[in-house]
Amino acid sequence: SELMDVNRFEIFADQSLRIKRLLIMLLVTKEAITGMKMANALDVSKDTIMNDLDVLENNFLKEGLTLNRQARKGFWITGEERLVRLTIEEILQKEFTDYDIYKLMSLLLNGGETEYFEMYSATATPIQEVFNQVIIRMRHLLEFENLEKLNYAELLNILIRVTIATVRLRKEATIGRYQLVAEQEL
């Protein structure tokens, strides 16, 4: 896409990509999202969203996750927090091409403060924003490390997992019986 001078994010999404985006949207929040809001976010009709949600529910949800529907309120996914995080991680891991990983590692190891990495399946979600914040923080941590000993696959896993954990913790979604401590208690 760079050779053709076309940003791959400008191309309309097919059903598979729309379903990934819908999953990410629904998994990063605890609130219901209306069909119209999802349609506007993906630039498709509400009927397309309804069809995609049916396919998502029948073919893409892991056992233990449930797509909930409520008239005039919207849609949301419920299930065990571990499954929610694993599903998000799986979507993000499968999205990266070899070129994306190369570009991401270059950005992580010697990128500038204003450089930005776009995640196609997480566009316009909290994951996109947090992912780039984590890149900047990790870059500062890696400044003093011996880069020859780094395992890029592990770096990518850490980057994705810290992003997911941060987004989910901001929504007060913890694994097990852990509880968030209020800042006043610290």
Language model feature labels by segment:
Residues 1-186:
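A cross-family "folded-core" feature that marks the main globular domain of proteins
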